Amino acid sequence: MGVTKKPDLNDPVLRAKLAKGMGHNYYGEPAWPNDLLYIFPVVILGTIACNVGLAVLEPSMIGEPADPFATPLEILPEWYFFPVFQILRTVPNKLLGVFLMVSVPAGLLTVPFLENVNKFQNPFRRPVATTVFLIGTAVALWLGIGATLPIDKSLTLGLF
């Protein structure tokens, strides 16, 4: 690798070029109109064309047709609602279950105020936020896995 020579800012030729705008931000091409008028619409229309083309060439059904007269024994929500479903399923009082669901985001909103003194971004130097994250992740996984099991094994996951 060669040694680069630093520019001499006292050089009158360089100063004249910099005054005309021929300095470090002169090279390249401008975003307007090249990118915004020509490249972005091509990418967006190309993406739409690919989606429409795949939908026309391979029209696949989403799931099986619904039969309103044959319902399953237990209806499960989508996977991302499993922890919430498990809370509502295991708590006997439904109002308490709704209160527990509302308390989760409310508790998460208090974490920045608990650690507002700590200015570090490293999670190992923010023990409260790291502990809340790890415990919350473990509880969410526990509740999510338990929601797929029968109600008698849901809290213990069939382990105990």
From Swiss-Prot:
Assembly: The 4 large subunits of the cytochrome b6-f complex are cytochrome b6, subunit IV (17 kDa polypeptide, petD), cytochrome f and the Rieske protein, while the 4 small subunits are petG, petL, petM and petN. The complex functions as a dimer.
Spans traversing the lipid bilayer: 36-56, 95-115, 131-151
UniProt entry keywords in alphabetical sequence: Chloroplast, Electron transport, Membrane, Photosynthesis, Plastid, Thylakoid, Transmembrane, Transmembrane helix, Transport
UniProt topology in membrane: Multi-pass membrane protein
Gene: petD
Protein family (similarity comment): Belongs to the cytochrome b family. PetD subfamily.
GO MF assignments: electron transporter, transferring electrons within cytochrome b6/f complex of photosystem II activity; electron transporter, transferring electrons within the cyclic electron transport pathway of photosynthesis activity; oxidoreductase activity
Protein name: Cytochrome b6-f complex subunit 4
PANTHER family: CYTOCHROME B (PTHR19271:SF40)
UniProt main location, coarse: plastid
Role description: Component of the cytochrome b6-f complex, which mediates electron transfer between photosystem II (PSII) and photosystem I (PSI), cyclic electron flow around PSI, and state transitions.
Domain of life: Eukaryota
One example of a Gene Ontology biological process annotation: photosynthetic electron transport chain
Subcellular localization: Plastid, Chloroplast thylakoid membrane
Keyword match Thylakoid: yes
Any one GO cellular component localisation term in the record: chloroplast thylakoid membrane
